[in-house]
């Protein structure tokens, strides 16, 4: 089958032919329709320090997808041939304390599709049936293919009650932008997002941001004053991994505020702990998606009117993957879709 793989320990990916995956007793085989390019795939493309330490070579990558079940293992129940599915990209052990307690998103032995094992940038993907998630017919293939990052945004944004709250999001990547739409959809009052990328900030405005702030030109404090915010933000969502953004978020938080961290800062990032301690802030780390509560919430929000369509800005045939990666690398894109049926 055709697949997009890391064949050598260096930059780039190669469209190649690989063996179609075998299907275990508890697996489903998915014929891929659409995939989306993730920031993780960009790290793999660039072959940065993280990728060099993490990605086995050779291996085909990718973990954002939608497709159709074409084969099932003999033990699989609850699915049928022809079901349209996306899937949870974190394959968990099922035996650690958190897995046995139903907290699989906290599994200490997680294996990542397209990171630690063969991925979805291919004509077929085999995964445990437990990880597959049926997609309702009213949700398009394009939207279903971005459920993985949509899930990151949902898990982060809905970690705390947002109804009537003022929310600050630092980092206008696709996940941060989707978090804007989620926060507004569930009833946040002011949703402010910061970045230095004007293209991405304009996307955030299209997704409903109260203010999209280029912090290279505009003061967050001035924006807060314009919005008549006298006590700071109630909820902070750090999506950038940039230390200065995290610092500005902590400074802008109200006493008793709640902060969710999805962005990954450098390991030795220093912060002013006085901002955390004396403000009584609650800080929560976010990894992946809750299985499968996050997935149910994603579907429910789309069915109740959440519009994520502006975040999908580019579409290419899978054979034109280099154009897709170029769009992502340019910084002037939202989500980029690769069509495996073209």
Swiss-Prot record:
Enzyme class: oxidoreductase
Note describing how the cofactor binds: Binds 2 Zn(2+) ions per subunit.
One GO term (biological process): L-threonine catabolic process to glycine
Family matches, as SUPFAM superfamilies: GroES-like, NAD(P)-binding Rossmann-fold domains
Main localization of the protein described in the UniProt heading: cytoplasm
Matches recorded under PROSITE patterns: ADH_ZINC (PS00059)
GO cellular component, one term: cytoplasm
Compartments, as annotated in UniProt: Cytoplasm
Associated pathway: Amino-acid degradation; L-threonine degradation via oxydo-reductase pathway; glycine from L-threonine: step 1/2
UniProt superkingdom: Bacteria
SMART domains in alphabetical order: PKS_ER
Keywords on record: Cytoplasm, Metal-binding, NAD, Oxidoreductase, Zinc
Cofactor: Zn(2+)
Pfam families given in the database record: ADH_N (PF08240), ADH_zinc_N (PF00107)
InterPro entries with a match to the protein in the record: ADH-like_C, ADH-like_N, ADH_Zn_CS, GroES-like_sf, L-Threonine_3-DHase, NAD(P)-bd_dom_sf, PKS_ER, Zn_alcohol_dh
NAD found in the keyword field: yes
Family the entry assigns: Belongs to the zinc-containing alcohol dehydrogenase family.
Name of the featured protein: L-threonine 3-dehydrogenase
Organism this protein belongs to: Burkholderia cenocepacia (strain HI2424)
Gene this protein is translated from: tdh
């Amino acid at each position: 089958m055709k697949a997009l793989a890391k064949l050598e320990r260096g930059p780039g990916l190669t469209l190649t032919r690989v063996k179609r995956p075998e299907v275990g007793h508890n697996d489903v085989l998915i014929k891929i329709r659409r995939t989306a390019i993730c920031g993780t795939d960009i790290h793999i493309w660039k072959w940065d320090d993280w990728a060099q330490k993490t990605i086995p070579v050779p291996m085909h990558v990718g973990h954002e997808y939608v497709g159709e079940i074409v084969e099932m293992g003999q033990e699989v129940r609850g699915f049928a041939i022809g079901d349209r599915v996306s899937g949870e990209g974190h394959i968990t052990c099922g035996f650690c304390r958190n897995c046995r307690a139903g907290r699989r998103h906290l599994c200490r032995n997680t294996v990542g599709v397209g990171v630690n094992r063969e991925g979805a940038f291919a004509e077929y993907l085999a995964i445990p049936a437990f990880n597959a998630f049926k997609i309702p017919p009213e949700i398009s293939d394009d939207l279903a293919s971005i459920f993985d990052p949509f899930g990151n945004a949902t898990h982060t944004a809905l970690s705390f009650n947002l109804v009537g709250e003022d929310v600050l999001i630092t980092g206008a990547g696709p996940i941060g932008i989707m978090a804007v739409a989620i926060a507004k959809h569930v009833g946040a009052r002011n949703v402010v997002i910061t970045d230095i990328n004007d293209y991405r900030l304009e996307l955030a405005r299209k997704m409903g941001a109260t203010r999209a702030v280029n912090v290279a030109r505009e003061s967050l404090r001035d924006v807060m004053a314009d919005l008549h915010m006298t006590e700071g933000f109630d909820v902070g969502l750090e999506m950038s991994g940039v230390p200065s953004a995290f610092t500005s978020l902590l400074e802008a938080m109200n006493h008793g505020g709640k902060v969710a961290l999805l962005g990954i800062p450098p390991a030795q990032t220093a912060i002013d702990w006085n901002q955390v301690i004396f403000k009584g802030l609650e800080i929560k780390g976010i990894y992946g998606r809750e299985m499968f509560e996050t997935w149910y919430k994603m579907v429910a929000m789309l069915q109740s009117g959440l519009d994520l369509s502006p975040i999908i800005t580019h579409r290419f045939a899978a054979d034109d993957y280099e154009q897709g990666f170029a769009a992502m690398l340019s910084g002037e894109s939202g989500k980029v879709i690769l069509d495996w049926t073209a």
